Amino acid sequence: FPASPVVWDSVDSISHLFEQAASQSRSFFGKFVTRFELPRTQKAEGNLICSFDQVLVTSTTDKNALLKLTPKDKRPSPISVLPNGVDLDYFQPNSDIQRDEETIVFSGKMSYHANISMVKYLVDEVMPRVWKVRPAARLIIVGKDPTPDIKAFAENPLIAVTGTVADIRPFLWCATVSVVPLLYGAGIQNKILEAMATGTPVVTTSRTLSALEAQPGTEILVADTADAFSAEVLRLLGNKTLVHEI
């Protein structure tokens, strides 16, 4: 019998993630450990993309990042982009729950260094600007395995850290805005897909757009500085018309 074709579902480029984390992460692991692991990861991924009949990734950015790692003496396998999806029967709007105009939500595994960096950026840079205008605004950090420094944010009465939850949807339904200030990353941000599927407006950075088909300004709000990011969050808080439109 002929050999069966072998497909590597890479999902994303880990070395591309590490390359960004080495310079931009706000966590010890993200900055120092990934810097140490980067050369080995680049070499491993470069060899892997030449070792299969087909390679799958979730975004064009990751495809291009992998192709750059191809050894000079080898030919890369075909790489196809297969974006992540979301279960629209599970993640959908819920008109029975009224959104709290002061609630902002962030979701993700809170031991993951990219998520830790995002939350630290939110707490240190974005939320102080939001609180100057809306002092009652609340940030809810939803996700399992929060590190001690993330848990410590809950000492602020305007910040909640949930840890593991059985169902993310109620937190998305009650929030006026989902925030994803991606400083570095790879692949598709599933947290954005889930929020959009529940009808929760998303404010994010331009780094997420290459993996999404959302239109900035009409389907998603985009800002790359703390001033601009907080301004977009404030645009949504208390503006039911805009919340409905995004």
Where are these regions (language model features)?
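A short, active-site helix/loop in glycosyltransferases that binds the activated sugar's phosphate group
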Residues: 42-76
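Short Ser/Thr-rich beta->loop micro-motif in glycosyltransferases that lines
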Residues: 163, 180-185, 207-208
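Acceptor-binding helix/loop patch of EC 2.4 sugar-transfer enzymes
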Residues: 4-43
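Conserved catalytic-core segment of nucleotide-activated headgroup transferases in glycan assembly
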Residues: 50, 68, 81-174
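Conserved acidic donor-binding segment of nucleotide-sugar-dependent glycosyltransferases
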Residues: 220-227, 235-240
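Acidic donor-binding loop of glycosyltransferase active sites
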Residues: 53, 170-187, 198-201
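Short hydrophobic beta-strand element within catalytic cores of glycosyltransferases
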Residues: 191-194, 201-205
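Short acidic/histidine- and often glycine-rich active-site loop of Leloir-type glycosyltransferases
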Residues: 206-217, 221-222
